[in-house]
Amino acid sequence: EDLSCTHVAAQLGEAIECVFKTLVLKGDRSGYFVCVVPGDHEVDLKAAARVSGNKKADLIPMKELLPVTGYIRGGCSPIGMKRAFPTYIHSSCLGLSEIYVSAGVRGLQIRIAPDALIAFTRAETADLIRKEE
């Protein structure tokens, strides 16, 4: 099963820059936090650590995803996790009228205005993606 954002964008008939993926990280100081980044980019772990007040941050192991969030890989939504974790959304969302994020089930997306997602998740926006080398 193709869980990539490229596949999701093609199924939706939308540009890839409108499809965001939800990643859960663990910082050395803050514990768990969430990054929502454009689907065609990778999260910059150093940038994520910096904005979340950590010296170091890593993606959580896949086996922790369900117990920590209540979601499985490919169906992790920034909305409705077991607990409200600090959330950071890549700043490119601000230039878009709507973005897509997982609805919490594989294959199901939510189309939402970035401002609404930011308000609902109490997120901060930041530059979170790795630069092309």
Where are these regions (language model features)?
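Extended, low-hydrophobicity, polar/charged segments
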Residues: 1-133
